[in-house]
Swiss-Prot record:
Name of the molecule in the record: Large ribosomal subunit protein uL4
Renumbered residue ranges of the record's region Disordered: 42-65
Listed GO CC annotations: ribonucleoprotein complex; ribosome
KW Transmembrane (keyword) present: no
Domain of life (superkingdom): Bacteria
Key words, A-Z: Ribonucleoprotein, Ribosomal protein, RNA-binding, rRNA-binding
Gene name of this polypeptide: rplD
GO molecular function, one term: rRNA binding
Subunit record text: Part of the 50S ribosomal subunit.
Organism: Vibrio vulnificus (strain YJ016)
Keyword Transport: no
Length: 200
């Protein structure tokens, strides 16, 4: 299949990567796994055995008229432990390479179908100036966009860093979450070829 390139000849790409049927369940599973992996999972509370103090019985078992109590750190008490205390845990989920590649291909194919993937021959800024990048994006009528280049472009990265709903990455920096987070994805022809090789 062919991808239209702005200001250049069409680019021949693999249908297996850019013309695949959308697998919603797979994309959902991979995106959820990414979100789960981003969780810190460092929350912690203390159970009755971990709260400091509470060794002595507060009052004798019988004869006071009060409810019996064995420790002041019971979960029923104020300053007591937590009944089912939260502990640090790893929320990450395993994503197989085949699943990851399948999700990426599904997303890229859907971007092509929805005409949200824009391919240009080359895209860069001469200096790390946000103003320069804004002008370039205005020319292309883009405001909510992920810019993907073949190589790391320091100037482009610095120019995009302070812009709302604009991000610049190289091919190694893209993932399923970043591809669906923006309204449009702007890729250089070089980046398209690299993505194709990466997902082959």
């Amino acid at each position: 299949m062919e991808l239209m390139v702005k200001g250049a000849a069409a680019l021949t790409v693999s249908e297996a990567t850019f013309g695949r049927e959308f697998n919603e369940a797979l994309v959902h599973q991979v995106v959820v796994a990414y979100a789960a992996g981003a969780r810190q999972g460092t929350r912690a509370q203390k159970t009755r055995s971990e709260v400091s103090g509470g060794g002595a019985k507060p009052w004798r078992q019988k004869g006071t008229g009060r409810a019996r109590a064995g420790t002041i750190r019971s979960p029923l008490w104020r300053t007591g432990g937590v009944t089912f205390a939260a502990k640090p845990q790893d929320h990450s989920q395993k994503v197989n390479k085949k699943m990851y590649r399948g999700a990426m291909k599904s997303i890229l194919s859907e971007l092509v179908r929805q005409e949200r993937l824009i391919v240009v021959d080359n895209f860069s800024v001469e200096a790390p100036k946000t103003k320069e990048l804004v002008a370039k994006l205005k020319e292309l009528e883009l405001n909510d966009v992920l810019i993907v280049t073949g190589e790391v472009d320091e100037n482009l990265f610095l120019a995009a860093r302070n812009l709302y709903k604009v991000d610049a990455r190289d091919v190694a920096g893209i993932d399923p979450v970043s591809l669906i987070a923006f309204n449009k994805v702007l890729m250089t022809a070089d980046a398209v070829k690299q993505v194709e090789e990466m997902l082959a």
